[in-house]
A protein has these predicted regions:
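Short polybasic amphipathic segments
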Residues: 77-87, 92, 96-111, 135-137, ...
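Sec-dependent N-terminal signal peptides
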Residues: 4-13
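Residues that flank catalytic or metal-binding motifs in active/ligand-binding sites
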Residues: 40, 49, 79, 131-133, ...
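Beta-strand-rich N-terminal accessory domains
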Residues: 22-99
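Extended, loop-rich substrate-binding clefts of extracytoplasmic carbohydrate-active enzymes
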Residues: 103-168, 245-274
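C-terminal motif of bacterial Sec signal peptides marking the signal peptidase cleavage site
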Residues: 17-18
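Short, solvent-exposed loop/turn and secondary-structure capping segments
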Residues: 54-58, 64-68, 94-96, 107, ...
């Protein structure tokens, strides 16, 4: 069993929200795990008090990215964790459950295919459980010899408003080998620079210990455009690719996924804008 801790450090002003699933309230006991239709509209708020927010959904996806004092329920940036299990034909998966049907026509431009990573394979079985400030997502798939448990948490400490107001969120991933053989796998966390505001300063990916920072500078007239979002892990053997393939349309994401499917760990330095 392997366990990793992924920390999201949001050094910009955010906000927060929540919701998810439906299936006949009679069929589900009070405070039990959410499964099936019950998970469809869950959005559990993550972030420190007064720091802004994003949400972890019932499938494990991230959405409601509300930054720069702007609540935005449709802001679902392309960012995801993934696993590649070596030697398995279908062993590469985003660490989320299937995308809910309602989303495919529910967000701006979604009918035109602007669904970010929606077309990538995900785990077929999943459940969600919340015990504030913790949210827990469990994932399983018969094609992948690894079960996954994700625990996401807020920096909420009763009577300690200072530490409870830190702009951080914690994501702990636990992997369990369900086969009778040794398994080799590559875990990755991937994100486009959703901090970017075109035409307002410069956007780039900066280096951080065991991770990376999504940066956007401000301008003299619009200094409020400046913002930073750091993603890092406590694993000292982390390899970071700061620059995806530069191309048009969906080329960057497609090449990123090709690398994930091949278990390729590219290490590119920071420095390029965009």
């Amino acid at each position: 069993m392997t366990k990793y801790l992924l920390i999201c450090l949001v050094v910009c002003a955010l906000i927060f929200q929540g919701c998810w699933h439906h299936e006949s309230a009679v069929e589900r006991g009070y405070n039990e795990k959410y499964i099936g239709e019950y998970t469809r509209k869950i959005a559990f708020p993550i972030g420190g008090i007064g720091t802004g927010m994003f949400c972890i959904e019932g499938t494990g996806a991230l959405s409601n990215m509300s930054i720069r004092h702007r609540p935005n329920v449709f802001n679902e940036p392309t960012m995801f964790a993934a696993i590649h299990v070596k030697g398995y034909e279908y062993g590469t998966r985003i660490l989320e459950g299937p995308v809910p049907e309602w989303k495919k026509f529910g967000a701006p431009n979604s009918s035109r295919g602007d669904g970010g990573s929606w077309g990538m394979p995900r785990f077929k079985e999943y459940s969600f459980q919340s015990r504030f400030p913790f949210a827990e997502v469990e994932l399983a798939d018969q094609n992948v010899p690894i079960d996954v448990k994700l625990v996401a948490w807020n920096p909420f400490i009763p009577t300690d408003e200072d530490n409870s107001s830190l702009p951080v969120a914690g994501f702990e991933y636990e992997f369990h080998n369900t086969s009778n053989e040794e398994v080799q796998a590559v875990f990755s966390y991937n994100s486009m620079n959703f901090m970017q505001t075109p035409g307002r300063g410069k956007a780039y990916i900066d280096a951080a210990k065991n991770g990376f920072i999504l940066r956007q500078t401000g301008t003299e007239n619009e200094p409020f455009c400046q913002g930073d979002f750091m993603i890092y892990t406590d694993n000292p053997q982390t390899v970071v690719n700061h620059n995806w393939f530069r191309g048009g349309w969906f080329d960057p994401l497609s090449i990123c996924w090709d690398n994930l499917e091949e278990g390729r760990m590219e290490e590119n330095p920071a420095g390029l804008e965009g």
